[in-house]
Amino acid sequence: MTQTQSRKKNLFQMNVNLMHGPIFRSLVLFMLPILISNLFQQLYNTVDTMIVGNVLGDTALAAIGSCGAIYELLVGFGLGIGNGLAIVAARAYGAQDEDLLKRTVAGSLVIGLAASLTITMAGFFGLRPLLELLDTPAEILEDAYRYIIIIDLGVIVMFAYNLCAGLLRAIGNSVMPLVFLLLSSALNVVLDLWFIAGMGMGVAGAAVATVIAQGVSVVLCILYVMARVRILIPGRKHLDVGRKLYWDLFSQSISMGLMSSIVSAGSVILQYGINGLGTLTIAGHTAARKLFAFTDMPLIAMANAASTFVSQNYGAGQPERIRKGMREIYLYSLVVMVVTVLLMQVSAEWLVRMVSGSSEALVLENGARYLRWTSPFYAVLGVLLSTRYALQSLGEKVLPLFSSVIEFLGKVVFVLVFIPRFAYNAVILCEPVVWCFMALYLVAVYRCNPFVFPKKQ
């Protein structure tokens, strides 16, 4: 074994091989660290919610909830860009082209920095007008703005971590991003208690704690890459990225970014409809959405695993392996749905009470109903997410983007037509209905992909 081969073996010793061996076993091994990472990343926001709800009350909880969709809009575009850049890196890794991989990293840093700064500036000037446009109740407007503006100023920190973690996952290493998040999540809990309960900083303390904790993740991730994963560090010659690769990175990242932001924009529109239903309804919905963010994690984690799996096997030229993998992912989504339905039927109201800290009947009733009505559609959501990510990984940039337009238009229709008539019941049914339409569309597009399903000669 040569010195170069030995070095590469050491560098990739934590990697899961997604291009060879048993498919489902490899997917699960790769997915589990992502699932645990997502769990602790969600704890950033959920710990905020629990402490805010229990220490500061329902009004402060509603303030954070009222800007939740805007937060997703701000961050979603940046995260989508990061995922798009990682897809290109995973293809290069699957093709075993180290030079292309390093040039991809160099181009990703340039595009990522520009995108995150743009998002931060847009949020800085547009957040207050957007909160007012969304008819945020006057009693929570100032707290909502105080929380979201701090989060906005930390977007670059969140983006930096997700890009770094995405590049590690692109080469099959999903373990180290988990380690960094475990450490920073513990810090986040300590800072939450200190800033909110100890120093009396209110909702601003929750936002500051989240940004600082995620900043620690960034530092740890960068130090690890510099010390142990030199293959992700471009040299001077790799700074000449080339127009073609820049375009591939730009178009892939913009497609993913727009897809995420259009979905988030639909959530902003839906939040407008929810804001008109009163503070207690907002509080109940906020608690339910926090719990939903936990229960759909197994689906999101597998969709992320599908993205890397499909990207690497696309780069390696293995369509049959992609077909088999996607079938197993669809079956996995069905199992997740069954488990979630059983859990929600038994414990939905107790979970809402635990997260919100509220004893108001309307808060508990609405939150529990949301969880019980949406959980039977989790199999559809799993198919939607994994197929959307797979199509992006196959180089489809426009057709998956169209699915997010369907979602946006569906939410607009519900806000204008159904929520005024059926109130919170329409809010609950909005997303399951949209999921069904999008899943049908995306599966049809996937079945027509010429690489995965080539026409017989």
Feature roles, as predicted:
Residues 82, 151-169, 177-185, 206-221, ...:
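Short runs within selected transmembrane alpha-helices of multi-pass transporters and secretion channels
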Residues 46-49, 121, 129, 163-167, ...:
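Alpha-helical transmembrane segments of multipass membrane proteins
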Residues 41, 45, 49, 53, ...:
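Juxtamembrane/transmembrane-helix interface segments of polytopic membrane transporters
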Residues 54-57, 91-94, 170, 199, ...:
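Membrane-helix boundary and inter-helical linker elements of multi-pass secondary transporters
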Residues 34-87, 151-158, 220, 247-313, ...:
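Transmembrane helix-bundle signature of multi-pass secondary active exporters and lipid flippases
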Residues 33, 69, 193, 348-349:
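Short, proline-centered helix/strand-breaking motifs
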Residues 1-31, 89-156, 198-254, 310-377, ...:
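Short alpha-helical transmembrane segments in multi-pass integral membrane proteins
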Residues 61-121, 158-177, 284-348, 381-395, ...:
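Small-residue-rich hydrophobic transmembrane alpha-helices
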